[in-house]
Amino acid sequence: MKRVLVRAPLLSQSGYGVHSRQVFKWLLSRKDVTISTHVLNWGNTSWMVNAEMEGGLIGEIMKRSGKPDDKGFDISFQVQLPDEWDPSLAKFNVGISAFVETDTCNPGWLEACEKMDCIIVPTEHIKKTIERTGKVTKPIYVVSETFPDEMLEPDVKPFPLEIDTDFNFLIVGQFTGNDPWNDRKNIFLTLKWLCEAFSGDKDVGIILKTNHGRGTRIDRQITSKIVRDIVSEVRHGEFPKVHLVHGNLETKEVAGLYKNPAVKSLVSLTRGEGFGL
């Protein structure tokens, strides 16, 4: 049996958190490893602490958690930004990261790659961006993101939406900045352009599933104010209506949101490559 360490934001409500849990779930399916977890923060995002969540996966993560002091691991999987990887944690160290969403990479991160034994990225785009930035001698593998089986289940119940608009655009993403120019997901301008394109159309609605980093009541108040301020500035009149969906949803609820018959189109105008995890 190989001793494996997963160092990652395994409990975080974030894209990196989802990616981390994908790695852990795969390792959990193997019979030839014993797993330890070193759970990290990811920005100011909330943590999942209910052991029953994700079909019990959160509980499996928590009961293996701690901050390991020994270096006796055979393999480490580290889901972080490259400059946060620690090549001393195991005999063989795997760095996993989404790196960048655009076509430019920090040259310093290539040095971090050279200290690991191999690198895993989610797309060919990211791999090519790294290789275009400079020479990396360590192998880089592309392992795509996955999506939950619930997304394909035909009997998923539509997520309840109290709306009265017939044709609705769905936007899913977190506010990652305080103005249109530093928001990576580009939600500010997405709202602006949809309001301009469908100005005065009472049959069109915009469903915005978002937050400002957390799923709390305080975050909802902050997020609601941001959305109100944006809409008051970019929308002339009462239409299109903007409907806010906030809070942490179970996987089946997210699937139900996508499958709600009121949702006719998914809109993503993110500034770079994005997955909406």
Feature annotation, model-predicted:
Residues 5-7, 45-131, 252-253:
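Extended catalytic core of nucleotide-activated donor transferases of GT-like folds
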Residues 6-8, 37-41, 77-80, 144, ...:
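Short beta-strand segments
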